Amino acid sequence: MSAAGFPSTMTSIAPPAVSGSEAKPVSRTPETYLGSLRGSGPAGTSARPANGAWTLDGRWTIADEYAVPETTGVLTFGFDARDVFLVIEPEAGGGTIEVLVDGKPAADTADVRAGVIAPAESRMYHLVRLAAAGPHVLRLTVKGRLRLFAFTFG
């Protein structure tokens, strides 16, 4: 530093501490595919699946790239992250998803309102935004024909 004209006693300044929505996302859950080609498949029928594991209730079709309920189905997922995203594609007629985190309606995000999402196009949807990462259980009650492709976390 002294070569640049700064005193040799000068030290670097640490960035300010941040928390809440400004904090860097931390995820301990890997990206998870729900289709049969890249996914590991559902992990039984537990109401509290382990981190990264998921279960299905109801009649579902697991296609190569996605999972889709026949009419109404429940997907339960264990995760350890602050943010949860899901790629969704509505089929004809669409549908809605009730989003619960630890048994309570998910807080509003850009896509979720009052714990419900109504996907209108094929894209990645922001389902969950928490104050901090931690172990949680996500429960999605899917009503209608919605293709669920992959979860990502932040």
Where in this protein do the model-derived segments appear?
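Non-globular targeting/processing and membrane-anchoring segments
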Residues: M1-G154
